[in-house]
Structures are given as structure tokens and as C-alpha cells.
Amino acid sequence: MILAVVIFALVIGSVIFHFASPWWFTDIVSQWDSIDGVISITFWITGAVFVLCNLFLAYCVYKFRQKPGHKAVYEPENHKLESWLSAITTVGVIAMLAPGLFVWADFVTVPEEATEYEVMGQQWQWNFRYPGADGKLGTADTEFISELNPFGINPEDPNGMDDIVVNAPEMHLPIGKPVKALLRSNDVLHNYTVPQFRVKMDMVPGLVSYLWFQPEVTGRYDILCEELCGIGHFIMRGAVVIDTQEDYDAWIASKPTFAETQAMAAPDLAAGQAQYAVCASCHGAGGEGNQALNAPKLSGLQDWYIERQLNHFKTGVRGQTEGDQYGASMVGMANMLVDDTAVRNMSAYIASLPDVPAQPTIQGDIANGADIYDRNCAACHLDKRNGTWYTDAPKLSGMNDWYFVTQIKNFRSGIRGLHAADPYGEQMVSMATAMAAKNTDDTKEMEDVAAYLNTIR
């Protein structure tokens, strides 16, 4: 009797939990309502089977419970019952699978008017490419991939010269027009997913997979990787913005073509040196930094990282958060650089300065720091702690240990990295938070990592 009541309560509780639960699909913003329909059919069929089977089980437990003088009847076969069960099961399976076949046929049949764009997935970032005025994407291959050509576009293919490249994890699409996403992976298995679109597809190295959809609602939606791709899988986030046609045209016009990125003039180091004179008062003539002024060492950092941080200070991505008083002082300094060329010149000059390792100021448990670094940081910043453009991770070895500790604290507390225009900072917030502490003293943990970083000078 008790078991029958428990089974009955389990059924009622499961049904209530499902309908009262806040965990359900996001609102759909594409034309793929049919996918939701197929899922609903599967839910109702399996849900009905779950309820009926368990209620029948509860009934049997109660009805045929052991009683004095009752003896179970042995019936090895019941052909009539087996036939009915087989028939009902067959109908149920067909009812679940058949609609999916029709939806799949639509999924693999891309409309002729669909516009193509390319998604490049790599650990742990998203980049995007759009066809230029000719409406065609140029060919690409991994042999051409470099810091200046992260998509591996074939420089000999004229169709690729006007391709619009977006080396950032945010893409835009116009509303109401079908689009076909060509999916490439630069390293391991990834998966391109926007939950609100209802479609997803694996990205396999060496292959070009695809999916298509038609955006129906303007807004900003998360891009997720739903294929385990390494330690940074959980921070592989991006965004797709569905625009009006006017807003989309303005956005796409602001992005460079592949030809423009390859023809960019070399930075003027002399001009950068002249501009750096103001910075030298805090950061030192050789970029060696000054802890007394909370000015970190700059020499040794990559030019692309310096350029990004200067632009972040100029645009308010950094230095505007409450509690970031030192970052706030950099806002005015960065805005002395009048345009992108000035920022590039300054960044290139700083990157050209001799890299003299900073003197250690922090002591810590090097073995513990090495363990924490290897588990959390090495995948992006590399074993030698010199960083790489591939993962947009700056150099850490030979830099100021006190500044490293300060910035990890800032990431953990949300002072840095939470601005919507700082996707790599957002990744660092997640990684800094996820660094496994073996004790309750977070500062000691950071100092241990800093001490380990100091072992390579």
C-alpha cells in the first residue's frame, strides 16, 4: 500500500514540477516553430506513457498485493497482450519520428535566396566572415592562418579580397532574411548554438558544416558552444545581434575587408615614441613600470593587447567602474590619442621596448601556484607564460607580480571584465572565479600564482 502511494505521489509531483518549473525553452526568434512542434509531440507521447505506466504500476502494486490465501498465477506467455503492446509502441515511435523527418528535410534544404556567412570556432572564441560586394566568400585553408590572417583566407583568391572580417565574438544579422551559416573549426570539435534559433550544428576540423534559419525578432542573443572543447569550454561565449536592415547595413559598413587588413600601413614607431613621452612619467622611459604610482610594466606586452586596452580606456570599457580609481586615471591619458593610427603607433612602440623582467615583490608557495596555473591558465597563456594572439591571452612572465594580483582581484570582484564590450574580460572573470582555492585566503592563492610566474624571468 505504501509503495503504491509513493508511486502515485511521484507521478503527480513530476507533472506539477514540469508545468510549474521555470526551466523551459527560451522564446523562439526564428522561423523554426516546427522544431518546437516536434519536441512537443515527443514530450506529450513520452509524458503520457510515463503517467499511464506508473499509474498502472501503482494500481497493480495495490490490487495484487500479497494477501493470505492468495497465490500468484504463472502465465509464461500472452500473445494478445504482446501484440497490443508491440502495435501501440510502434505507433508511438512512428508518431515521434515521422514529424522529425519532415523537419529534417526542411533543415537540409537551404533556400536559394539565403545569404551566406562564415563562423570560425576555435579555443575559446568566435570569429565571423561575411561576403563582400561580390556576394561570394573567398576560399580559406589552415595553411594560411596567421596573426594577420586568422581566418586563413587564400590571398590568391580574388573573391576573398572584399570579404568582411569580424575578428571578435559578436556578429550581426538583418531581420526577416534567410541566412546560411558555414561552420569551420580551427582546432577541435565545437558546436554553434543560439538557443533562440532552435538550430545547432557541430563544427568539425577539416570540414565545413552548415545550418540555416531566418531571424524574426530583433535583439541580442547568446552564442554558445555545446560541444566539450577543453578547459575553456564554459567561457566560449559570443553574441548575435538581429538588426533592422538599416542598422545592419551601418554595422557591416564599419567593418574592414580582408584586403584592408592586409594593406594596413606599418605603424610609425617614431610617432609612437613621441606620444609615449607623456606615459613615461608614470610607466618609465623603458616601460619598466612604477609600483609607487600603480603604473604597471608595459615592456614585453604584445602590441595587439596594448592596443585593445588603450581602446578600452578610450571608450569607457575600462576605467568607469566604481572602485577602479587607477583605471579612471587612464581614461584621460588614453583619450590623448586622437585616432586609431595614434593608438597603433603607441602600441607598436611600447611592444618594441626591451623586455627587462620586473623584480619580484611577492613571495608565495611556488608549487601550489604552478598547480593552479596549470589547471586554469596554461591553456590560454601557455606553459611558458608568454601568451599568444591565438587565444588573445597576453604575456604574464616577467611582468609585475603586484599588478597581476591586483587585476585578478578586480576580475573576481567585477571591477574589471563585466562590460558588454569586453568579451575577453568576461572570460577572465569566469576563469578568475573558477580558480580552485585550497584555502579560504584568496589573496594567498593569487600570490602563489604570482610567485610561480616569477620563476621564469
Which stretches of residues belong to each language-model region?
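Alpha-helical transmembrane segments of integral membrane proteins, especially early/N-terminal helices
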Residues: 1-19, 48-55
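Short, structured interface segments
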Residues: 241-258, 340-358
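Non-transmembrane, membrane-proximal soluble domains of secreted or membrane proteins
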Residues: 15-39, 61-266
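Extracellular/lumenal glycan-associated surfaces
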Residues: 300-303, 309, 398-400, 407
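Axial heme c-ligation environment in periplasmic c-type cytochrome domains
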Residues: 236, 290-297, 313-344, 350-353, ...
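Sequence/structural segment immediately N-terminal to covalent heme-attachment motifs in c-type
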Residues: 260-290, 302, 341, 361-386, ...
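Extended non-catalytic domains of envelope/secretory-pathway proteins
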Residues: 215, 227, 273-283, 294-308, ...
